[in-house]
Amino acid sequence: MTFCLLPAFTQAFCGCIFINPLTMSATLSRMDCCVGLPHCMGWLPSPVGAVAFVMEGALPIPWSYYLNSYDKHVLQQLDCLCLFPVTCYQSFTSYVTGDEVWSLHCHCGRQGSLQVGPRRLQCLAAAKVRELVVQKFLLGTRFNEYYPQYRVHANRYVNPGLEYVGSVWCGKHFIYVRADGAEFARLKGLRARLGQGVLFCESLLSCYVVIVCQQCACPPTDAQVDHCMRLLSFTLRRWQNLLLGRSGSSPLIPGFDIPRNRTERLRQRMLHRFYSYRTPIYRLTYLRG
């Protein structure tokens, strides 16, 4: 996984990340189609690697980069291209044990089998198709279980408010960065300086900045993962400096840059124990540090 910066490494120094800019506005408009009253379509088990997203309560799916043109057309006809199709309703219990489930919802305006109407069978059929598509995407979170060091290195020099959460590997590498409300709004205002391939996904539960990497090799190798996480660390540091009104990616004091954000280091230890030994994570400790 090379972040698409390997063939054009000079773009990294401009904060540019990786996708055709001509498709950006069209992509966001197609994905933002959560209209109508939602209703539950089914439940999906949560993989072990998705525990960090369970803590956030929601996981956006960039459909235009995940699906091919035919699948995207079919799901669009079925009103299935909601940007946040799954939420974790069991994410507010005291402990996260790995037995959580994701709720899959639809915006077709019907209540599935609870309401008889002209679109009832279509909704039920769409639910089965959508379950397969979303479950495959959720399985891509196993990347976080296989490469726990990725988060450690990516968040090494970042402050609270702009942190890498996890990745989804499903044909492409989808990188999820969580931003607090104020930081999220400021980053949107700096969108022109962040570069290409940066998607902003906002819901009531969380705010994500999603980076889509199109040229990472499949399957990933250890060397590619190491290179990818170094470039992400560089990018996050540059974004942080932009928010602080500084240019470049240099530390605040030249020659002196130590790891910070103790809350994030505590979360990393809890995630490591969960991935290795399935040790339950106490929610309040994880969220508050």
From Swiss-Prot:
One of its GO terms (cellular component) is host cell cytoplasm. It comes from Murine adenovirus A serotype 1. Coiled coil: none annotated. The lineage of its organism: Viruses, Varidnaviria, Bamfordvirae, Preplasmiviricota, Tectiliviricetes. This is Probable early E4 33 kDa protein. It is found in: Host nucleus; Host cytoplasm. Its main location: host cell. Keywords: Early protein, Host cytoplasm, Host nucleus. Plays a major role to prevent cellular inhibition of viral genome replication by nuclear bodies. Assembles an SCF-like E3 ubiquitin ligase complex based on the cellular proteins ELOB, ELOC, CUL5 and RBX1, in cooperation with viral E1B-55K. This viral RING-type ligase ubiquitinates cellular substrates prior to proteasomal degradation: p53/TP53, LIG4, MRE11-RAD50-NBS1 (MRN) complex, ITGA3, DAXX and BLM. Belongs to the adenoviridae E4 30 to 34 kDa protein family. It comes from the Viruses.
